[in-house]
Amino acid sequence: MKLLQTPLYQECKELGGKMVPFANWEMPVSFSGLIEEHNAVRKNVGMFDISHMGVVQLKGKNIKSALQNLVPSDVFRIGPSEACYTVFLKENGGIQDDLIIYDQGVLDTNEESVVLVINAARKESDVEWLSSNLSKKEITISEFMPEGALIAIQGPESISTLEKILEEPLSNLPRFGHRTITSNPNLINSQESIFIARTGYTGEEGFEFLSSPETAKSIWKSLIASGVTPCGLGARDTLRLEASMHLYGNDINLDTTPFEAGLGWLVHLEMPNDFIGRKALEKQAEVGTQKKLVGIQVLDKGIARKGYPVLYNSETVGIVTSGTWSPTLQKPIALAYVPSEIAKVNTQIEVEIRGKKHPAIIVKRPFYRKGF
């Protein structure tokens, strides 16, 4: 099957992006090099083409009431121009996807609207699942800004850099706040708009914005001209792992629940509303989990990768879900599921790397925290 290309594919190629297959897309894994890109985001500012992500709009009546039946988080805690991170669940409590819900309030058409940003690899199944569960509601499901380009700009200098380019005040936009910009010198067409949110996947200050391909290309080039470092999937992965942000398919999947994955804070059992997976999570909240996701530091130079066994008292007890060399901390880090009874900070364990046992220790998550 031919790989899909984002609207910024050519721009990435021209900057030397090394393209690789990812979730049926052809995406840049790196430009100048993973370490340089990683450090640019931690110390200055970098940007990513994330146009492969799924962006879906729900419009109609009583949107949030309908959506509340599908997620374990209280969506009424957010209002217009606010957003929240949450998960879709199966009846057994397993995670179907993680996503961000953006509340757009009531549109000019007198319809309620929310925008969902979902994982690229789960887009098709998520939309089918939404359609099935919302079929009896007066709700339309469509792609938000079809053919649009989505850019993430991340790092301590992201606010000042983006404010200069967009000529728009952004420091007053709260974390997980969002707005639609309809009048801006960067807009190629006066009928267009820029959807911008103070969100990210790096553990740093940052924004993500969606616009038409033409406007996105113009802003992309302006950001490059201002010295912003283009970054690929490689740096995006090391940055998110340092911040202990989950990667669907690695750290969370249909066989893991929010309580097991350290995402219990997303489950609001105190609200009266029923939701898919509630009974399973109520039971797990009562009796506890058999496994938990933990942070691991390998104590030598060995790098734990997805699928590597975790040992305790010389017995295999778990498996690594994500692992890398941390450019910021200068040590090997990983996430892994282990039995709940040993999921305690400072527990001595081992990771088997290419047939050899390496000493490791369970540590606090996130490995890196800055600002938030």
Curated annotation (Swiss-Prot):
GO terms for molecular function: aminomethyltransferase activity; transaminase activity. GO terms for biological process: glycine decarboxylation via glycine cleavage system. It comes from Prochlorococcus marinus (strain NATL1A). This is Aminomethyltransferase. It holds the Pfam family GCV_T_C. It catalyses: N(6)-[(R)-S(8)-aminomethyldihydrolipoyl]-L-lysyl-[protein] + (6S)-5,6,7,8-tetrahydrofolate = N(6)-[(R)-dihydrolipoyl]-L-lysyl-[protein] + (6R)-5,10-methylene-5,6,7,8-tetrahydrofolate + NH4(+). Keywords: Aminotransferase, Transferase. Its EC number is 2.1.2.10. Gene3D superfamilies: Aminomethyltransferase beta-barrel domains, Aminomethyltransferase fragment, Probable tRNA modification gtpase trme, domain 1. InterPro entries: GCS_T, GCS_T_bac, GCST_C, GCV_T_N, GcvT/YgfZ/DmdA, GcvT/YgfZ_C, TrmE/GcvT_dom1. The glycine cleavage system is composed of four proteins: P, T, L and H. The glycine cleavage system catalyzes the degradation of glycine. It is an enzyme of class 2 (transferase). One of its GO terms (cellular component) is cytosol. Belongs to the GcvT family.
